[in-house]
Amino acid sequence: MSRHPMVTRLLCLVFSCLIILACSPAFAGHGAPKAQKTGILLVAFGTSVEEARPALDKMGDRVRAAHPDIPVRWAYTAKMIRAKLRAEGIAAPSPAEALAGMAEEGFTHVAVQSLHTIPGEEFHGLLETAHAFQGLPKGLTRVSVGLPLIGTTADAEAVAEALVASLPADRKPGEPVVFMGHGTPHPADICYPGLQYYLWRLDPDLLVGTVEGSPSFDNVMAELDVRKAKRVWLMPLMAVAGDHARNDMAGDEDDSWTSQLARRGIEAKPVLHGTAESDAVAAIWLRHLDDALARLN
């Protein structure tokens, strides 16, 4: 039976990491079982936009404040982002590289917290990596993975409430707010319409659109036409206000959401703040991390 190319690449990477571990002095010999050493691995898609990076830094600060006795490490799932960061001299390990490094440092139990928005392809790839590292003879004893932002129906409702708490103070009643998600061909794209349902229960002028999924920007425009909107707020539904937020949402290009709104006579008010900058939204990720840590025991 042939393997999916992604699975084959993952296995090759894991085996390469295991060879490195096997040759490491930290794993030489057959001493007594290691004492439990717990760590946290925060995993984001990543961003190459320097102005957007403080959002992730702030998330890391929150995690360290909540768990001051547990070391925190980082990894990034986007290969292209890792390459750009490394070209700038910034350490940017993949999840597999980070887990191998933590095993070499002597960690035995690791809570991996996804900072993705939905359980799409990136999150499921992270699950496969984490499962591959758990229970290896000279690796990590236990690895648990915290859900992404919208991991359950209850999360969708909580995220809707958190987004309402994060709305711009200058927004006037009746002014639509459009949250831009990434979108995906993965079945998890259904999370966006699910979030839309809970937002509409709170405020009928809160809309969800995506760059590559559903609802599309055409769907959003249809809703704005019904509302005869003259002023619309645009906010990223992504952990950071990176390339999509600054170009696809707020850019000067003809196909940006801001430009398309302007051609219809609608004033766009982009807000370049990722969801990881919102304390209310971040609290949901922190709860997922607490659950992941609890599952280590």
UniProtKB/Swiss-Prot annotation:
The keyword Aminoacyl-tRNA synthetase does not apply. It comes from the Bacteria. GO terms for cellular component: periplasmic space. Co(2+) binds at H182, E212, H244. Residues 1-28 form the signal peptide. Keywords: Cobalt, Heme, Iron, Lyase, Metal-binding, Periplasm, Signal. The active site is at H182. GO terms for biological process: anaerobic cobalamin biosynthetic process; protein tetramerization. InterPro entries: Anaerobic_Co-chelatase. Pfam families: CbiK (PF06180). It catalyses: Co-sirohydrochlorin + 2 H(+) = sirohydrochlorin + Co(2+); siroheme + 2 H(+) = sirohydrochlorin + Fe(2+). Heme binds at H124. Homotetramer; dimer of dimers. Catalyzes the insertion of Co(2+) into sirohydrochlorin. To a lesser extent, is also able to insert Fe(2+) into sirohydrochlorin, yielding siroheme. Its periplasmic location means that it cannot participate in cobalamin biosynthesis and its genomic environment suggests it is likely to be associated with a heme or metal transport system. Belongs to the CbiK family. This is Sirohydrochlorin cobaltochelatase CbiKP. It comes from Nitratidesulfovibrio vulgaris (strain ATCC 29579 / DSM 644 / CCUG 34227 / NCIMB 8303 / VKM B-1760 / Hildenborough). The lineage of its organism: Bacteria, Pseudomonadati, Thermodesulfobacteriota, Desulfovibrionia, Desulfovibrionales.
